[in-house]
Amino acid sequence: MRLPCEVEVRSCHLPTLGLKSRGKGVRAVVSLCQAPGRNELQPEARAEPGGHACLLVSTMKDRQGTSYKLRENIEQLFTKFVDEGKATVRLKEPPVDICLSKANPGNLKTLLSAMRLAHRGCDVNTPLSTLKPVKTSEFEKYKTKMVITSKKDYPLSKNFPYFLEHLQASYCSLARVDMRMLCLKNLTKLDLSHNCIKKLPATIGDLTHLQELNLNDNQLETFSVPLCTSTLQKSLHSLDLSKNKIKALPVQFCQFRELTNLNLNDNELIHLPFKIGQLTNLRFLSAARNKLRNLPSEFKMLSLEYLDLFGNTFEKPEVIPIIKLQVPLTLLESCEQAVLFYRIPYGPDIIPYHLCQDLDTAKTCVCGRFCLQSFIQGTTTMNLHSVAHTVVLVDSMGRTEAPVVSYFCSLTCFVKSSDMLN
């Protein structure tokens, strides 16, 4: 059997000599092999004769590998973090620790069980590998990082290595996301910058471990709702949508609660999602060179380290507010407010879809109540330093203020806040 993982082999004598290991593993293939007898010893496999099974550690630099006797030679197995794909094998001779990490937990447990049997001299039920050098193609299968920066290097006739965690495919003239990429379930970072992608498939949301997605310099015009409601909302930390043609982001975009870094530079955005305040973990926000006219009221709820809104077409706050009050409230408005206030679950399987849209796009008054069809809209000016530690100037005049739209559920709330309005 063979196990792809990262391996660090360190001497047990280092602590007594006052030395530390370099503490970094290398990508390797660990094999449980049949150890040859004295008359069967193969020149390419440096194994101890006479044992039943041996452990062979092969790396890209040493494909023949180094073999270690197992029978009555394991001093201790450290398996506290085996569920995280980590374990350490301490041998008596040579006195080394073989530290395994980034392994498949299930396969690692199988290997450790077989090693225990080999140590006791028992028959190992698991099929044993042969003492032969690991082929280069074998390491290719277990690659965790792949960088492609030209069209000629893009693989057309073969699949991507299944264990990839980081994939970059830039300057490849891709018109769509390659469906083969969506089979890479271990991906944590996907970089498709500098291509010609116009639409994202909803199945990107099936990459449950994806933390960083870079789509800089493509031709995207929209960001779909299914992506916003996929498992990415729990895993995605960094999203780069700069240099595209996006005009608007859906309300559901604010369900990416784990986002810490968002780049929206050089798009055609007229406004930001009005529930942007729900992105409570967001620390770095760039939306420079768009067509933003104002900021949503929930923008005040952000707590950023860095903010760049340079080069937008911010409008001057309007003196006269927009009044759309309905007195008395319609029955529909009252019911919708009650659903939101009491947090009653709703969905298209319970109420009509257009009502779900109304509830999803409800505004919040400064008093905390919800506004749907009945509200007063006013505009205030906000100093961006109140939400960000570092602020890039809004324009060449050196300003750091921007207009913010506020909503009021009643005339009373509007009057109380009138001193904040221009």
Curated annotation (Swiss-Prot):
GO biological process entries: protein ubiquitination
Stretches that traverse the bilayer: none
Pathway membership, UniProt: Protein modification; protein ubiquitination
GO cellular component, one term: nucleus
Cited Pfam families: LRR_4, PH_LRR1
Positions of LRR repeats: 184-207, 209-230, 233-258, 260-279, 280-301, 304-327
Subcellular location field: Nucleus
Key words of the record: Leucine-rich repeat, Nucleus, Repeat, Ubl conjugation pathway
PANTHER family: LEUCINE-RICH REPEAT PROTEIN 1 (PTHR48051:SF52), PTHR48051
Its job: Substrate recognition subunit of an ECS (Elongin BC-CUL2/5-SOCS-box protein) E3 ubiquitin-protein ligase complex which mediates the ubiquitination and subsequent proteasomal degradation of target proteins. ECS(LRR1) ubiquitinates MCM7 and promotes CMG replisome disassembly by VCP and chromatin extraction during S-phase. May negatively regulate the 4-1BB-mediated signaling cascades which result in the activation of NK-kappaB and JNK1.
Subunit structure: Component of the probable ECS(LRR1) E3 ubiquitin-protein ligase complex which contains CUL2, RBX1, Elongin BC complex and LRR1. Interacts with CUL2, RBX1, ELOB and ELOC.
Protein name: Leucine-rich repeat protein 1
Organism whose genome encodes this protein: Mus musculus
